[in-house]
């Protein structure tokens, strides 16, 4: 049995916690950056981990004056870079073990 706690936030609470206006959240959802449960803004339920993504999206939009399409692309590229870095680290560790056993 898992002890994972899942916290869901309604639109009002999500906006408060992320410190972004509802109009931003609607744009973020419309561009597929986050995907809440529910079919309309008043019924949307967000997972708490989506707060970080929404905050990043709003910051990119505001600070770099990116359109929402550009924000979505930038976040996808950031995620891909993070995945590649993690894979690179795993491969370095495997190589280190291989080289270590070959020299021993």
Indicate residue ranges for each PLM-predicted region.
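Arg/Lys-rich, alpha-helical DNA-contact motif
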Residues: 2-12, 16, 26, 30-31, ...
